[in-house]
From Swiss-Prot:
Pfam families: TENA_THI-4. It catalyses: 4-amino-5-aminomethyl-2-methylpyrimidine + H2O = 4-amino-5-hydroxymethyl-2-methylpyrimidine + NH4(+); N-formyl-4-amino-5-aminomethyl-2-methylpyrimidine + H2O = 4-amino-5-aminomethyl-2-methylpyrimidine + formate. It comes from Glycine max (Soybean). GO terms for molecular function: thiaminase activity. This is Probable bifunctional TENA-E protein. GO terms for cellular component: cytosol. One of its GO terms (biological process) is thiamine diphosphate biosynthetic process. May be involved in thiamine salvage. CDD domains: TenA_E_At3g16990-like. The gene is TENA_E.
């Protein structure tokens, strides 16, 4: 039975196996009530503004995390293509920060006055722990893939046919829900699967725990944005 499970994992990839295993939590992160409220057009403006301001702070903390993953790829990866994928993602973060500033201005948010809420601090703390030289590349790239994929899956749901996403939020949803970003997430997933296929049992355990931690932090971040913390 165990050999059959291992064969399936090899065929479909470890990340797919884990998402299947932890589907309830994954759905909680990608189909959160906040996302559903965007999709059906009932979102509270205050919730969106809270998310926007807090996510700006998160992205600023995300930059050094991605830089650390790039360094780990340089040191530990057996494929030079990894660095190119990660570097491409890192380069897009400058534009992302500019977008947040423009969007905040549009919504009347003074970003210099924004203070990180506890859920945000906790999530940024997780990123910081992954920046340690002791954190394995396999674990860090699994987290990176999961973080990006939750946003892609969530916001893609808001621009699917039949959605009633408010026009003023369409740009936000397209930013992460578009097909190109989906392909980028697929590239990260391919890297993660390759690393996990060669990982030790201990690394696999750490990576799975990290995936669960990312999903839990994503749910808490959405909860924070809705005000129910």
């Amino acid at each position: 039975m165990e050999e059959k499970a291992k064969a399936e994992q090899k065929k479909i990839g470890m990340t797919e196996t884990w998402l299947k295993k932890h589907r309830l939590l994954y759905n909680g992160a990608t189909r959160h009530p906040l996302i559903i409220s965007i999709r059906d057009g009932t979102i509270n403006t205050a919730s969106f503004k809270t998310w926007l301001a807090q996510d700006y702070l998160f992205v600023r903390a995300f930059v050094p995390f991605v830089a650390s993953v790039l360094i780990k790829a340089w040191k530990e990866s057996d494929c030079s293509g990894d660095m190119e994928v990660i570097l491409g993602g890192m380069a897009s973060l400058e534009d992302e920060i500019s977008w947040f500033k423009t969007e905040a201005n549009k919504w009347g948010i003074s970003l210099s006055d924004v203070v990180p809420q506890q859920a945000n601090k906790n999530y940024c703390g997780l990123l910081e722990s992954l920046m340690s030289p002791d954190a394995e590349y396999t674990v860090a790239i699994t987290a990176f893939w999961a973080i990006e994929t939750v946003y892609q899956e969530s916001f893609a749901h808001c621009i699917e046919e039949g959605s009633k996403t408010p026009p003023e939020l369409k740009e936000t949803c397209v930013r992460w829900g578009n097909e190109a970003f989906g392909k980028y997430c697929q590239s990260l997933q391919n890297i993660a699967n390759r690393c996990l296929q060669k990982a030790s049992d201990e690394e696999l355990k750490k990576a799975e725990v990290m995936l669960l931690s990312v999903l839990e932090h994503e749910v808490e971040f959405w909860n924070m944005s809705r005000g129910n913390v």
